[in-house]
Amino acid sequence: MKTIMLCAISSLSAGNCSEDCHYCTQSAGTKADIKRYKLKSPEQVVDEAKKAYANHALGFCLVTSGARLDDQKTEQVACIARAVGKEVPQLMLIACNGMASYDQLKELKNAGVFSYNHNLETSRDFFPKICTTHSWDERWQTNLDAKATGLQLCCGGIYGIGESKTDRASFRTSLKELAPFSSPINFFIANPALKIKTPRLSVDEALKIVDDTVLALPNARIMIAGGREAVLGERQYEIFDHGVSAVVIGDYLTTKGEESCKDIAKFKQMGFEFASKCH
């Protein structure tokens, strides 16, 4: 029987980011209609983790808004990771907290984090056109430091933000060099508050992106994340015919996802089992 890995997201904090990433509704200066809040309590996140596990999630991603970790935020995320690990030890903890130093990443690993998610987002050449407050090279270095600590790497990006086919190929070459454990694919969803005004990707183009990513990263778990429902619509479950082996269930950081119960029922109908441990 075929197996897929399900991942759920806990947005520990939201909004008020200092960075100007043009594709993100949490970025500086945007007036997007999103929830903005400071750090959730460990108890609140543990409750979310229990619900995620009940919905067959293996991965549980602890996400904070903002450009990077500082020592205080590192300890806060580590505290939450320890609390979740104690109450729901079956979950594979993923941290997604922006740019970080080797020592900060090591602290997260020691707190029970299995994998660090820090997306390159796009090619090195195109990145300055969609973000000016930090560099692609800083993102690259964080990924190298995460690998150096022994954390598994979760690294991918976003498509449909105005990048060329050459940018996509260059981006995938960089991912191939990093050799991540898992690689999320996000499809851009337009928002009136954002600077990017590109048309939505077609379903066929989105699936071609999936094909090219699977080909470039044969040893990685290819995960479809943001934009799955909006871009792929009724054809969203075709992703599994194109080599995808992981999906995000439930809501994303600032956009609604498919209802978990609907996804799970469909996955079962398709004959999938749910991964219960990492390989």
Swiss-Prot record:
It comes from the Bacteria. The keyword Metal-binding applies. [2Fe-2S] cluster binds at C61, C96, C154, R221. [4Fe-4S] cluster binds at C17, C21, C24. Keywords: 2Fe-2S, 4Fe-4S, Biotin biosynthesis, Iron, Iron-sulfur, Metal-binding, S-adenosyl-L-methionine, Transferase. GO terms for biological process: biotin biosynthetic process. Residues 2-228 form the Radical SAM core domain. Its EC number is 2.8.1.6. The keyword Iron applies. It catalyses: (4R,5S)-dethiobiotin + (sulfur carrier)-SH + 2 reduced [2Fe-2S]-[ferredoxin] + 2 S-adenosyl-L-methionine = (sulfur carrier)-H + biotin + 2 5'-deoxyadenosine + 2 L-methionine + 2 oxidized [2Fe-2S]-[ferredoxin]. Binds 1 [4Fe-4S] cluster. The cluster is coordinated with 3 cysteines and an exchangeable S-adenosyl-L-methionine. Binds 1 [2Fe-2S] cluster. The cluster is coordinated with 3 cysteines and 1 arginine. Catalyzes the conversion of dethiobiotin (DTB) to biotin by the insertion of a sulfur atom into dethiobiotin via a radical-based mechanism. Homodimer. This is Biotin synthase.
